[in-house]
């Protein structure tokens, strides 16, 4: 596998250019690879060996303490959440989506009732003041969509995701 070629084609794919293709680095041996400056957004890094790799600065999720963030729900709704200091949290190498083991619901668009929103596929309702816990939590930075409660650091990102 020619990593440089794969990443160049991935960049073309991100830009919607001809001959571009999404990078699939599943199971790739990236030991000691210098990935600084590489745009890995949307790349499949599942089971990739990243031991000793020089990675881009990817930590956007605060490592300690509680903090406020935004959760995209169904029908374009976005709620403000708090990630408690006791929650496990991470974000992936390939995007700006973060995830936590639990969150507290703070505010949402609904002013009339305590239900701020829902995720019908997951059967989860978000009520003002409620603590919501993930069924399980996966801290693997190589995977963007995996177990945990997903959220974004900025409202703008959450609104984009909710309305895509």
Where in this protein do the model-derived segments appear?
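Intrinsic low-complexity/IDR segments
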Residues: 1-27, 31, 36-41, 46-164
